[in-house]
Amino acid sequence: MGGIILTSPGYLELLRSNKTFARLWGSNMILYIGDWFTVLAMFLLAGDATDNSPLAIAGVLAVRSFTFAPLEPITGMLADRYPRKYLMIIANLFSFVILISFILTGILDNLFSVYALTVLLVVGRAIYDPAGTAYLPTICSEEELLTANALISGGWSASMGIGAGLAGFVISDTVGKQA
């Protein structure tokens, strides 16, 4: 019926030909791996703070979900009004400073602190996600978008296993040495 047929580049071709996207994808992989590492650590910290209460551990996931929901419409408007690249950088720096502050002060031994850190990290992520999604069409051509979205989505899925696996390895190694 006369529709336009777009041909998408392959994954490696896109990463080689679009350096801006390749940098974004690489930084997203680091971000996603760190996120999943942190999520698993938050589950374990909630368990440690409560003698492994399943309710407290599930609370981390609930806090993440219930924090994202009301924030994303607001942060989506931010992504429409301000430079997306800078919002992404600010969001990551905010999350880094918050995480390091909590770690260095050693206050993650109670459930309230674990939940507070979870909320603050989600705030950073709620700023980053809509900005990143809106930024993608500005650095990729229409033909590249299908492949770019597939790489971003696949990277997120792969990072879940990598980040959680690394966290499990590091945490079990640390706990094993303390025992």
Regions found by a protein language model. Name each.
Residues 41-49, 103-105, 162-179:
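Transmembrane alpha-helix termini and helix-breaking/packing motifs in multi-pass membrane transporters
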Residues 2-22:
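Juxtamembrane intracellular "pre-TM" segments in multi-pass secondary transporters
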Residues 12-14, 105, 127:
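Short secondary-structure boundary/capping segments
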Residues 51, 83, 105-109:
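Helix-breaking motifs and short loop linkers at transmembrane-helix boundaries and internal kinks
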Residues 18-19, 52-53, 110, 176:
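Short loop-to-helix capping motifs
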Residues 22-39, 60-79, 83-98, 113-172:
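Substrate-agnostic recognition of the 12-TM MFS/MFS-like secondary transporter fold
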Residues 41-66:
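Extracellular/periplasmic helix-loop-helix junction of adjacent transmembrane segments
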